[in-house]
């Protein structure tokens, strides 16, 4: 595996999942695997769980890890080809990436979408520029369209709580939010669940908030949240802004906030959220504090 950008870079998702669970049980099992290697983590946006967990994972493998916060620890970067750099961006990725490639054996990058220019965001120009000019394997720590490490942690959590002897139903339900939120977590979760192929998967959202079909991989889609929740064994709660009317926030959809009344429709479902969460906007306090909420398990994975 040269790069890990999405589930499409994973040769065998079942093997990867078992390996990840093994490392959870025995975190120092391959302490010398990364000996002598250096991992550079390039953060263009805030991060808590991805940042810390990746640093810990690198340490457990014996790697040295270096964190760079773009615009804070190092110069603001320019990614446009042919740009006349007379603005606030000081260094071009064509110059910075080869330098980082000389320092590091592996480069991780985290970047958010603009949520203004769909074509540019979905081209994944940031991570592709790093892959093009860095000369090193690249690890996605979240990009404009996907979040593979989050999805792997999600799948690990589901695997740990699978009901015995039957195929589970997994519902991903849209949740309200006060500002535009990227589609990357929802896109990625859909891709990974469909690639895993061990569950009946349904996505529920209001009209106008359909995800890009290329990420749904044939998953069932409904505008009826109650229908999606009916009999679900797992419920993934997540906001995303409109793809069709790119970046738009739903004006009023409080009824989509997950509450105990919604939970009653499920098959005593385990509850998932990638965090951070806007309590009592996306999800009620009672849901986040519920014994079946696995958000902290996801973070640990």
Which residues does each PLM region occupy?
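Phosphate/diphosphate ligand-binding glycine-rich loop within oxidoreductases
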Residues: 32-40, 47-159, 278-279
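P-loop/Walker A phosphate-binding loop and immediately adjacent motor/lid segment at beta-alpha junctions
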Residues: 57-59, 66, 126-142, 201-204, ...
